[in-house]
Amino acid sequence: MREDGKIDYVELPGGRDLPAVKHFYQSAFGWSFVDYGPTYAAFQDGGVDGGFQADPEAGLKAPLVVLFAQDLEAMEAKVKAAGGVISVPIFAFPGGRRFHFTDPAGNELAVFTEE
């Protein structure tokens, strides 16, 4: 069950060859994937849900921890009030919406809601 403020999934850089990344994790660890377009593949059997973002233009250079919120706008307001800086405004993607923020230490995280 998804809960506000809990880690929901981890997004990892997928590099320029997403099929090769998927093949590696399938072969080495037995993971299976669900593709969301040509540049994103989600996994659910790696111990925690997650996905690989293959679009080199997306700017993802490190793992991205994604938190969950029922009310995305309310959570965005809480993040701002607590001193977080919104680095990517709310946007839609297949399966939901999310925003990114940086914490006081400069770590980038995201908050997601289902649609």
For each predicted feature, which ranges?
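Conserved active-site alpha-helix within GNAT-family acetyltransferase domains
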Residues: 19-28, 99, 108
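Vicinal oxygen chelate
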Residues: 66-108
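Short beta-strand micro-motifs in enzyme catalytic cores
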Residues: 8, 39-41, 63, 97-99
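Residue-level hotspots at or immediately adjacent to binding/recognition sites across diverse folds
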Residues: 9, 51, 78
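Conserved short beta-strand elements that form part of the metal-binding/catalytic scaffold
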Residues: 31-62, 108-113
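Tryptophan-centric aromatic hotspots in well-structured domains and transmembrane helices
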Residues: 9, 14, 24, 31-33, ...
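Short secondary-structure junctions
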Residues: 29-35, 85-90
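N-terminal beta-strand motif that seeds the catalytic metal site of vicinal oxygen chelate
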Residues: 1-22, 63-65, 115
